[in-house]
Structures are given as C-alpha cells and as structure tokens.
Amino acid sequence: MASSGEDISNDDDDMHPAAAGMADGVHLLGFSDEILLHILSHVPSTDLILNVRRTCRKLAALCLDKSLIHTVLLQKDYQASEDKVRQLVKEIGREIQQLSMAGCYWLPGSTVEHVARCRSLVKVNLSGCHLTSLRLSKMLSALQHLRSLAIDVSPGFDASQLSSECKATLSRVRELKQTLFTPSYGVVPCCTSLEKLLLYFEILDRTREGAILSGQLMVGQSNVPHYQNLRVFYARLAPGYINQEVVRLYLAVLSDRTPQNLHAFLISVPGSFAESGATKNLLDSMARNVVLDALQLPKSWLNGSSLLQHMKFNNPFYFSFSRCTLSGGHLIQQVINGGKDLRSLASLNLSGCVHCLSPDSLLRKAEDDIDSSILETLVASCCNLRHLNLSAAHHHSSEGLGRHLCQLLARLRHLRSLSLPVCSVADSAPRADRAPAQPAMHAVPRGFGKKVRVGVQSCPSPFSGQACPQPSSVFWSLLKNLPFLEHLELIGSNFSSAMPRNEPAIRNSLPPCSRAQSVGDSEVAAIGQLAFLRHLTLAQLPSVLTGSGLVNIGLQCQQLRSLSLANLGMMGKVVYMPALSDMLKHCKRLRDLRLEQPYFSANAQFFQALSQCPSLQRLCLVSRSGTLQPDAVLAFMARCLQVVMCHLFTGESLATCKSLQQSLLRSFQAERPALNVVIFPLLHEGLTDVIRDVPLVHLDEITLFKSRVAEEPPNLWW
C-alpha cells in the first residue's frame, strides 16, 4: 500500500509526449532507446510483456530490458486477470527481483502460488492476496533469496504447516509487513533476522456469527518474536479492543529487551489505549538506550507525561502527535528544543492537536486565536517539511500583518502535502464593516428533515465569475507560494463522516466552525493555481454557494487523480451539482471519486457527467437520504470500462440496493475480474457486516473518510 496517499501505480496516460511526437511526423521507434525505455516504464507489466513486446523486434528487445522486468508492479493493475498473471510469470518470472501484488484481491490462491517460479525474488508484496498456510509454505520454500515480505494472516492460518525450507527462507527475511485478520503471531517468530516490522491489526471483535473473539495467543518458547536486530517497529490498529490485546503481546517481548539499533517506533491507535506496566518499562528503556529518528505514540501515553523531554532524537524525519493534548509550549520545548534546527524533519502530523499552536492548553478555549510565534518557530526550525497535517483543530489567526497561519506556512517551500482545517484559512476575525455570514446549520433543526438555509442571498450563476480568487486572500497567497503541492486537504474542524468504521452510520454531525463561514467559492477557486495537484479533499465548507470554484480546479489541475468532496454548501440541497458536472468534463486523469453529501441525487445527469472521466476506476457515494437511479448506474458502468469499484450508500431500500448490486455483478464481473460492487442503505443495521467484506485496499484508500497527509512516515514500505 502506498503511504501518505502517494500514487505508485503504473500511469499509462503519461505517454502523451510520444503521441505528440508522432503527430509531428516522428515515428515512435525513431526515439532513442533511453526515451523509449522511459515511455515503456509507464506501461503496465502485463500489457508490456503480453502485448507491446509482440509488436516488433525492437520493442521485443526493449520490453525485456532489466530496468523494466526486475521490478514488476501489479497493484492497481485491475486488468491483470488470472491468465495474464500466470503467463507473465511464465515468461519473465526468473528475471523478476521485486514483485508487488498488493491489493490483488481478485486473484485466487492458485494463481498467487505461481510466484514460487520467481526464484530470484528479493522483495515480494502479497498484502491483500488470498494465501493459505500450505500455499505460503510451498511458495516461500522456493524463494531462497527473499529479504522483504508482505502478507496477510487470515483466520485458519497455522504456523505448524510451514515447512523447514519455508522457515529457512523466513529466517533470512529482514523486512516484514504483516496484516492480521485473526489473533496470531503469524510468521514473525520464524523471522529471526528482522530489521523492519510493520504490523496492521484488522481483527474484528466478533465473528460473523456473533461469537466474541479472544486476543490470547498460545505463547511458548518457539513462537516468541525475535527483535534483537530490529530498527523499525510500526503498528497500526483498526478500532476494537481485541486489536489492542494482541498488540500488547507483540510489545511485551520488546519491553523485556529493547533493541539497541531501534531508530523508529510508531504505534497508531484510534481512541484510547491504556498504558500498562510492560509498555511503561518499554518507554523507560527506550528513553535510556535508543536514539530515534521517527516517533508516534498513542495519545494516552503522551498526555500529561514528561516522556518527550527524556527521549533522544538524531536527525528525526517523522513525528506524529495526532490527537495529543500537546501544547505549543511543550512542542517548542520538548520536540524542537526551543528552536533547535530540525531541517531533517520531512513529515509532521499534528492532526487533532487542538492546543499545539498555543502556549498553554489549560486556559485556552478551542476557538481562541493561535500564538503565531509558536508557528513561526516551528516553520523556521522545520524548514524542509514536505508533509504537514494540522487538521481537526481550530487554528484561528488574529489580526496582524504577516502573522496569519497561511502567511507563515507559505515559507515552507518544500511542502508537497498539506492538511488544514477550513477555519484556519479564513482571512481574519470578522470585521465590523463586514456583514457576518449566516451559519448554515444554526438556524435549522438537526434531525432528518431537509435543512433550509436562511439569511443567504440567492445563488448567482455557477459561471458568473464570482469565484475568481482574490489576490489579497491569505489562502490565495499561500497556494501561490506552494506551486508544487501535490496533496491538499481542507477539512472542517467539526467534520465527522457519516460512515465510521465498525459502527452504525452517524446520523448527525456538529455544526461547522463560525470562522469557516467566510471560506467559500473564492477559496475553492484558488486551488486551481496548483498545476501539480494529484489528491484533493474538501469537507464541510458551508459557504460554498454554487461550487463554481470546482470548475477552476477541473480546468487547471490536470494532474488530479483523486477527489473527495463532503458536505459542501447547504446540507438540505446539493447546490454545486451543475458546477461539479462541468468540472468532471475536464478531469481526464481522475481515478478515484468520493462524494459524501446528504440528499444527493445520483441521477442520469450525474452519471452522464461522470462518464466523461475516461480514467475513472473507483467511485464511492455516501448520502444520508440520498437517491439513485438504477438504470443510470448500469448505463454509466457500461460506458466507463475502467471502473472496478462502485460503492453506493444511500437512502434507497434494501431491495432496490440488492437488485442493482446483483445486476451490476451479473453484467460486468466476467469482463472485469477486479470488480467490487457494494450497494447498501447507509442507515441499515447490517452495514457493518457489509463493510467487513470490502477489500482493505478500497476500504482504506477511499470508502472510509480520513485525513491521509502524514498518516505514515514517507517511504514506509516500498
């Protein structure tokens, strides 16, 4: 899985320069081998070997160049059918040294097993693939050169079925990424040379039949993890108590003897995770014996603790203090050491740290203005930051020349991804000479009925030019100074998705921050300055009147790959539909679209507009009381041949949803092996059971809403 939202899949629509050359009368084969190899590197491996290679002698030779076949990436190659993968392995398997089949959930174990033919493999990523213990054993027994492995551990896994040859291979593995769907050590005890361990805990508290699972493992001398050479430990937990129980068993061994070479220790836990005696011993040992360059801890381990001031860091590149009650004073004193040079820091996650830009957390209210001197110190010390997350907090700037949050962040010229709360980009506190905007939800009930926005002038034409960004806007200036930004998130500080993980759908959300009322179409239009933008999230912008700024983005952000829009404008009416339809005409490279909006009508007009996105692969719609037209969905899927994921959660009846889902699968499954369709009522009590069957790659990347900037360290996994 790509970290921090990075897109590492093959990009065959980047071959346009060659097409342009041919239009000028230059034949493709007239280019040098070096240029041709660069062009061919953007062609999916299956297409390269099974099709392009057979066109002529020159391409036949180039397609077998080591630079193209030593590393094969099949993740997100949704056209990679069973036959294609088997044929690919048969033809170049012996040459492949690095193979990623991450998220290839549609391939059966019998096909994945063919990886055993790639005997030169050094790295292989099989996360999301179906493999039994016996098949894994057979495959690993043949891969004697393997040093990096990523697998899933599913119910039924039995380490006793692993052969001695398999265990010999595992003993040489230095990097392991293991996604756990059942309480287990997996293959960790067999990996006696581990230097990097990544653990993803996705264990559900109950079985499908409702039985409560136990997190206890059979712990014996033979199945204790070996951590003596460990340099990187990373654990990410999905919600649920059982994931916390199991991770404690992994941590218990670390607390007995902390590896001296440990330099990255990261635990990502939603909610609270109580500190135990063993974890306290581990942290004390780390403070005494190790020097870290990456750190993330559960908020309950840091809140009220002096731990940070005892930790030792050397050229740190990643910090995450997400949801911690870290004050700005502590941030400066304990992390930045009063302004110490932290030019090495590449990624910083302060999401949900509501007091991190204020000197003291005890006397501050959430809506109080920030202390700009703290942010100024942070910016000066961490001048090479590439990824910064300040979402899920109220970071309000006071009046003051050059002291606005946007003006200070504009100094971070190396930023490539940025996540901000909507209220933080408002120009300033409302002035006496400016009529205040009417809050979108304050004057209306918060039940299921449609909300009527009062005190707002009638909407102008979406294309009247009123969304042109104002050069005097601090947000406009910020984006002007960050022209190479690739990932931008503007998320309302009070926003919560209607579809959380492992819980019923949320029926109501908190009203937006009052400062967010002055952020609307003009600010959205300013995003059009970002010519290199690839990923965009806009959530809870109540003052979007027409969505005309979206057209600006569609016209100018031609690199846009993923778009997530949630709760824009008035909650009782989708006011931006005409603008969105016009925007989509220009999104030729858009692959992922997620829309979350109450009362959204997924009608023929919407799907007709969506059909103009030729690269679209994944669609997710979440709409309380929303409607859809089954015929329009079927026609859209017939026109858009690249779409392999269609998730629609609306207010339609269960019968309507089931009928449409069956029709889609019956019509398109045979031609699209990776097709994943979920059509289900958003507020139905069975939603949790439906979600558990969604492939993790889709669930994690698009179906569930979350901030993805600085979510993980850069380049955590290849």
Curated annotation (Swiss-Prot):
LRR repeats: 77-103, 104-128, 129-153, 177-201, 324-352, 367-392, 393-422, 468-492, 516-540, 542-567, 572-597, 599-623
Repeat found in the keyword field: yes
Entry keyword Repeat: yes
F-box domain segment(s): 25-72
Gene Ontology, cellular component aspect: cytosol
CDD domains (UniProt xref): F-box_FBXL18 (cd22128)
Alphabetically ordered keywords of this record: Leucine-rich repeat, Repeat, Ubl conjugation pathway
Biological process according to GO: SCF-dependent proteasomal ubiquitin-dependent protein catabolic process
Subunit structure of this chain's protein: Directly interacts with SKP1 and CUL1.
Function: Substrate-recognition component of the SCF (SKP1-CUL1-F-box protein)-type E3 ubiquitin ligase complex.
UniProt-listed PANTHER family: F-BOX AND LEUCINE-RICH REPEAT PROTEIN 18 (PTHR16134:SF19), F-BOX/TPR REPEAT PROTEIN POF3 (PTHR16134)
Name of the protein this chain belongs to: F-box/LRR-repeat protein 18
Gene: FBXL18
